[in-house]
């Protein structure tokens, strides 16, 4: 129980020798199991003012966020729900609850194993975000929320707090001027923060299948994998020349937006 994979992205040093402010930019997985203590911490320690939910309609209905007093809730679906077959939906599909009519569907690793069998894991799973007008517009809207002034913290979340949320963190840290290796290290921290879940689902998956290729893929899908983020950067560099080019031409941030973000979130 509790909030999975929650962390503050503050404290990182930028290439021009500033630091990302602490306690203002938070990332996490779904909040439906947040304990009273979690909620208290978010409100009293972080002075949480806004939650941006990046999930699909189905994910939200299966795990509703708690209502937090005085906290503005914003919903930005990163994945286009109208594109049923696209690899875009792979990320969301593995979190959908399977039909109750399948007896073994209650097994904790069932959804992940089925998702892998259906081809949900690909090292290129984030690259559709780079080429999707829809997803880029949603991330633009995400940055517009970041640019609104507030006195407390802003938190963004999806289901696992690693893919859509991870991409949002990568783009945010890049816009703030943090170097690529540091950004990737932060992205990979999911494997530490979710270590228990990864170990549990991996051992449960071994009860469902003996297929070694599937079992090797489970931790990459429950956690994160370096190759996925490398491919994401490769796609950005191929299509936009650089991360800076992607933030400006792909996401639509102006020079002024980036200057303002840095003024707000660096010290």
What spans do the regions from the language model cover?
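Cys-dependent protein tyrosine phosphatase-like superfamily
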Residues: 1-155, 167-267
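Ser/Thr-glycine-rich phosphate-binding loops at phosphate-binding pockets of nucleotides
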Residues: 159-160, 164-165
